[in-house]
Amino acid sequence: GLSFDVLLKRIFRQDPDIIMIGEIRDAKTAELAVRAALTGHLVFSTLHTDNAVESVMRLEDLGVPPYLISAVLRGVISQRLIRRVCTECGGAGCEACAHTGGKGRIAVAEIFPIDDSFAEAVYTHASPRELYRQRKQKGLPSMYEDACAKMRQGIITPQEIARVLG
């Protein structure tokens, strides 16, 4: 039969340089993505996690051993979309924003490039707390910190941060 993993295997045979997998939902897809990355393909995909560090934990939950995660993972971007403050009325509500105070959305994100020290931490099965500590030590802002910076610029509201990031 024609399944997702069969289609992925067929794509791999075409020897593309870059492969985009819409979402890694199960162990089989995770295994195929890792195998593709190990053979020199640049693989992009999505995972349902709350932040960048949890993406590593999710791959482990899907059965990818830490030594393989550390070998193939090059970076993680985690994002959420938050409603922007309407630029016409400053959030008070007007016809341009249908009296909601917000118009459009903007991403709040955390970007986590994987360097040697982080790969080593993953390889040695470091705790999530240690991975968060490394992120902070490198000066990489969390998604919450990115949201707060956008709030200070007047782009989003504290209420939206609370609604989306909890």
Q: What are the roles of these predicted feature ranges?
A:
Residues 1-166:
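Short, flexible helix-loop junctions that flank or precede catalytic/ligand sites
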